[in-house]
């Protein structure tokens, strides 16, 4: 962030480095792969998964936010590569006016916040499915609509709230950087996202543990057990997806926090070398459709295996009670 449109020497050195250029190319590759894997994820989601329609819609909404973020971050990556190759000798036209960046910044925040809020929405939907005794299509459709609208409203408002009263009269080297006067609120937002991701992780762990204990409650009712197994497998896939995203975001955020903390103790060269790789959010976003595809295929395999076990299993009442006792130990 700067009051001048001219870049300082450290920024020019950073953009001129092979490390910076390589990182932007890797980001672009991750962005392109996100678009490709999203196509396969949506196709598999509607042709091979046994998720409820409400879960499918919320997953598609999350994929939309992921691709929205990647698209606009890709525009920034191309801009930064252009500067690295063609504007190094023109430092006074290097910086971007905040007034021209604010639209991109709001959209990028809409994408990133939409993914976090969307994960929370998915877990709320799974909580309803897990604890509702009669989770019919009509009920799931209503809950899905409410969650989707809330996620849309919150994600659309995030960027506007952060830059609410910012004069937006400074300069930045990239449009995904928050405006100078909004920097503190942007940090509060990222802290909120970290807390919300942690809450999502705790909810996912609770649901997984609860479903594990409830898995054998319908041991002697094959039809009910089959339906329960479908619910457990779909919920397990969503929870694993959330846990994986939490781990990725946590490592990314923790790395950035450590780097900022030791910034004064290391040289500009080392800082510039590390920061572009620790801020690798396009790679984190790529993981979402990839893990989704993996989870759909894995859940189908586990479901088929469980059906086979249910059909072939012959268990006495004593065996069942022993297994139930072990589950609660």
UniProtKB/Swiss-Prot annotation:
GO MF annotation list: G protein-coupled receptor activity; olfactory receptor activity
Keyword match Transmembrane helix: yes
Membrane protein topology class: Multi-pass membrane protein
Keyword vocabulary terms for this entry: Membrane, Transmembrane, Transmembrane helix
Biological processes, Gene Ontology terms: detection of chemical stimulus involved in sensory perception
InterPro entries referenced in this protein's UniProt entry, alphabetically: 7TM_GPCR_serpentine_rcpt_Sra, Nematode_rcpt-like_serp_alpha
Keyword Transmembrane helix: yes
Lineage top rank: taxon: Eukaryota
Transmembrane segments: 25-45, 57-77, 104-124, 144-164, 188-208, 240-260, 273-293
Gene Ontology cellular-component terms listed: membrane
Pfam family, any one: 7TM_GPCR_Sra
Subcellular compartments: Membrane
PANTHER family linked: SERPENTINE RECEPTOR CLASS ALPHA-1-RELATED, SERPENTINE RECEPTOR CLASS ALPHA-10
Family: Belongs to the nematode receptor-like protein sra family.
The name this protein goes by in its record: Serpentine receptor class alpha-2
Species name: Caenorhabditis elegans
